Amino acid sequence: MADIVIRNIDCITGESKESGKDMLHNVTLIIKDGYIDKILTDEESKTPFGQELIDKECGNAAYILDGNGRVAAPGFVNTHTHIAMGLFRNYADDLELMDWLQNAIWPAEAKLTNELVQIGTRLGIAEMFRSGTTCFSDMYFFMNDTAN
């Protein structure tokens, strides 16, 4: 039984552009237990088997969504973050780099507490999830607090 069926959605596959399979158009995604269980192309959806499968899954699905005009993509991976620094966004952002670091950021970082780093990390994770990032590698101080 499907949890979610999304019809008419475009899907980035992760295949190379040269393969010609980098993007699927007007597919049906069948999602079970939080995972994509099946992807039916537009052609497959129109076969008797495909239509029967979609009808069965749609009949049992908690949600049936129209994905027209939307794109499903694999989760993004951010391999270099300073995640808690999101707390300093827009802080003295009109300064040149070294002036910004030496006179604004480094003095502010010296006042960071473990709790503030954890709050900044949670904020950064929420922002990444909203933009499709599902995994990150952090390069900031307070590694244990970031992990917590």
Where are the regions a protein language model picked out?
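Residue-level structural signal for beta-strand termini and adjacent loop
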Residues: 41-45, 77, 89
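Active-site loop-helix segments enriched in His/Asp/Glu that coordinate
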Residues: 109-148
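Active-site gating loops and adjacent loop-to-helix segments of metal-dependent hydrolytic enzymes
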Residues: 87-119
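Divalent metal-coordination and catalytic microenvironments
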Residues: 9, 29, 34, 69, ...
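N-terminal metal-binding scaffold of metallo-dependent hydrolase/deaminase domains
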Residues: 1-56
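Active-site metal-binding motif and surrounding structural segment of the metallo-beta-lactamase
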Residues: 46-73
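Histidine-centered catalytic micro-motifs
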Residues: 74-86
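Residue-level marker for buried hydrophobic side chains located in beta-strands
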Residues: 5, 63, 75-77
